[in-house]
Amino acid sequence: MKVKIKCWNGVATWLWVANDENCGICRMAFNGCCPDCKVPGDDCPLVWGQCSHCFHMHCILKWLNAQQVQQHCPMCRQEWKFKE
Amino acid sequence: MAAAAVRDGDPGPTQELLVAWNTVSTGLVPPAALGLVRPRKRAAGPRGVPGIRPWGSLGSPGSPSLASPAASPPLHPFPTCPRLSAPFPSPLCVPSLRSSALQASSRTSGAVPPKEEELRAAVEVLRGHGLHSVLEEWFVEVLQNDLQANISLEFWNAISQHENYADEPQCLLLLLDAFGLLESRLDPYLHSLELLEKWTRLGLLMGAGAQGLREKVHTTLRGVLFFSTPRTFQEMIQRLYGRFLRVYMQSKRKGEGGTDPELEGELDSRYARRRYYRLLQSPLCAGCGSDKQQCWCRQALEQFHQLSQVLHRLSLLERVSAEAVTTTLHQVTRERMEDRCRGEYERSFLREFHKWIERVVGWLGKVFLQDGPARPASPEAGSTLRRWRCHVQRWFYGIYAGLRIEELFSIVRDFPDSRPAIEDLKYCLERTDQRQQLLLSLKAALETRLLHPGVNTCDIITLYISAIKALRVLDPSMVILEVACEPIRRYLRTREDTVRQIVAGLTGDSDGTGDLAVELSKTDPASLETGQDSEDDSGEPEDWVPDPVDADPGKSSSRRRSSDIISLLVSIYGSKDLFINEYRSLLADRLLHQFSFSPEREIRNVELLKLRFGEAPMHFCEVMLKDMADSRRINANIREEDEKRPAEEQPPFGVYAVILSSEFWPPFKDEKLEVPEDIREALEVYCRKYEKLKAMRTLSWKHTLGLVTMDVELADRTLSVAVTPVQAVVLLYFQDQASWTLEELSKVVKMPVALLRRRMSVWLQQGVLREEPAGTFSVVEEERPQDRDSMVLIDSDEESDSGGGGVAARRVVPDLTGLCPQLFWTYIQAMLTNLESLSLERIYSMLRMFVVTGPALAEIDLQELQGFLQKKVRDQQLVYAAGVYRLPKSCS
């Protein structure tokens, strides 16, 4: 017997490669979106800090904007720097 | 002159009084009545009265035949009146009076009754003696006695002859004769009554008012005459009046140039035309019912006219005919209604019946002698006729509404076509008090005809939708709908596929409830988000109509009025979340299992639903649709990349993925699966391409979903199939090793044994694998003859599928359900072998109970199954009769 596959239509879910499930700020799932967004994925991306923590981009930006003096990661309190 | 004698002090006042009394008494009542007092044997007399004679030859009071009682002159002028007997000794005891009494009576017993002046003089005498006060009372008394003893018996005797006459013309003649006889007997009394009235007017008599006396006489007449009416008499009268009406109606038709004014207007209806020609062809006259040659319509009309006149003169018209007329009218109306309206909902009958009623009222005018220029319509007569018209109309509304109420279920079922019937019913209901009857009857009809397990949910919903539309026309306040359809809503709540059906209807997926899709796309929908709570915000205050009494006071009227079909359906469960969730999973199914969905339609549906359910709940669905679009783009992207590469780097087969945002889709079943090396590689390659495209993101494959098209090349045949990834993977393992035990395979595939066995059943079905011995599966390289049967089935199945001709083929999209119906087929065959015959619903529910072979299979719905079964019927593998499927004899 020989099976010849002509076409494989698969179904998959995408997920962020992150070390956590939920955003530490909004507590929403990374694979979902932040409370201000409607559409996940490209429209509501994640960003990583050099401290290896990651958040919804919109969430961390909001957080950073709220910081008066120095910008810290809300999780580890290290200075926040975007991971390049 | 007699009065003058009294005043002059005439020596014989008593005698004078007696003479006067005799004059008066013999003048006022026929001699026969006065003879009454004598021996009671007279009571047997009427038996001897000559029977019926031809009209016109009836004896008058003076005629010899009737003179027999008068032959012995009345000797007792004071019949049984106790008050009179004391002051006035019987004339028999006063010999001196006898001669004058005889003289007076002999004068009257001749053909000539005493002249009016004489009588008047006599009355003056009586008045002089103060006796005028008893005169009227005495008159009534005599009349009553005469009626009791003679006239009544005579009349009924004549009537009882009718038993010998079977046919109507004779009956009519007899009736006419009998009443003629009666009239001739009563004629003297009526004449005297007029005199008495006149005297009363002149002040000679005290009277209780002229009207009083006349009324009394008539009451006595009616009372005595119809004290006990034989049934047969009523029946005869009724039959004759029925005939009269028909003859009259017919004569009206003929009267207008041979065309039928009633039929003319409605000859467009096929039914009416047929009826009209039948009438023309019939050898019988439509009026009198006898042969056209012997039609007696004309005579009948004349005779009826005579009869009415006689009855009218006797003031018996109402008494004799009212009941018969009423019954006849009721009967005729009912017959006509049954004949024309029953089952006919597509046109209004009100106008036609109004016209007809006007003609019936014309007939009534004839019966009650109130038409014709000769008789200027007195206000009283007008009012009688008005009363009758009112009665006929009310009766008509009542039974018409009754008929429609009885048929309401069917009317509702046919709704858009049966609108005229609904509007008729509405008109009638406003005039009759039949609301409760309607509610009860409709509820009962719903219970018996709709709300039982034999009806498809989708049909129930369809009927409910029609009911909403129809009853809204009937009752804009929607109270009838609310009350009568409560059982439907309650029942739908108990059906588990209700939500699915409604949602399917909303998205235009099912055939039965297509209305919903239309309804959904209507503009300006009532939002479910904000029920308009403010009570009187809309409309002119002038147009305000209170709610019917049976409305539920707990609910606001405007909300009830404004609710539309979709909001009513959605509110069956009291919450819209259920519907949104159902819609979501239905959408997910469609998107993932039917790769041939139409994005435009889905987007449109979601947009329309957003208008109803609000933005937020539909958000998930929007993301789902966006995922589909994104996936397509990504696939195209990757494909483009692939094509740029050299041929040797091309993947061995095309991999496409639908990439979902997991948070927004309904949860998926997670099945573990160990994919063979080459496949895993291909999938990982795809995954890497994705990761390159979307930074920091990766894919997780869901093997339970998807579709793999492949060719299975066996020694003697090649199968081209479309299966789920799991099924494909399982078969792939058999490529390298032709035989596996279930346990071994289970370890390799990393799938529980039971699940694996279910997945493999497809291949057993296809004849690719066989289980021999139990628990060991091996590839069937060469087909054995006993397997051929199933192979033939598959071939024919695929052929008709690819042909795409029939409804079924269109519905069971070949590459999405693939082998699934085939899998069902074994189950169905087994079921039918065991249970002989099953209905569609039964098969469906049993399949749902037993066949749990994965999401793709659970997907098949009732319509698909039906399509599949119908195809089997066409291929003569099944027999369908009387709503059940069975296997053909040879097959079992």
Swiss-Prot record, chain A:
GO terms for cellular component: anaphase-promoting complex; cytoplasm; nucleolus; nucleoplasm. It is found in: Cytoplasm; Nucleus. InterPro entries: RING-box_E3_Ubiquitin_Ligase, RING-H2_APC11, Znf_RING, Znf_RING/FYVE/PHD. Transmembrane segments: none annotated. A zinc finger (RING-type) spans 34-77. Auto-ubiquitinated. PROSITE patterns: ZF_RING_2. One of its GO terms (molecular function) is ubiquitin protein ligase activity. GO terms for biological process: anaphase-promoting complex-dependent catabolic process; cell division; positive regulation of mitotic metaphase/anaphase transition; protein branched polyubiquitination; protein K11-linked ubiquitination; protein K48-linked ubiquitination. Zn(2+) 3 binds at residues 34, 37, 44, 58. SUPFAM superfamilies: RING/U-box (SSF57850). Keywords: Cell cycle, Cell division, Cytoplasm, Metal-binding, Mitosis, Nucleus, Ubl conjugation, Ubl conjugation pathway, Zinc, Zinc-finger. Signal peptide: none annotated. Its main location: cytoplasm. It comes from the Eukaryota. Pfam families: zf-ANAPC11. The keyword Calcium does not apply. Zn(2+) 2 binds at residues 51, 53, 73, 76. Zn(2+) 1 binds at residues 23, 26, 56, 59. Pathway: Protein modification; protein ubiquitination. Belongs to the RING-box family. The mammalian APC/C is composed at least of 14 distinct subunits ANAPC1, ANAPC2, CDC27/APC3, ANAPC4, ANAPC5, CDC16/APC6, ANAPC7, CDC23/APC8, ANAPC10, ANAPC11, CDC26/APC12, ANAPC13, ANAPC15 and ANAPC16 that assemble into a complex of at least 19 chains with a combined molecular mass of around 1.2 MDa; APC/C interacts with FZR1 and FBXO5. Interacts with the cullin domain of ANAPC2. Interacts with UBE2D2. Together with the cullin protein ANAPC2, constitutes the catalytic component of the anaphase promoting complex/cyclosome (APC/C), a cell cycle-regulated E3 ubiquitin ligase that controls progression through mitosis and the G1 phase of the cell cycle. The APC/C complex acts by mediating ubiquitination and subsequent degradation of target proteins: it mainly mediates the formation of 'Lys-11'-linked polyubiquitin chains and, to a lower extent, the formation of 'Lys-48'- and 'Lys-63'-linked polyubiquitin chains. This is Anaphase-promoting complex subunit 11.
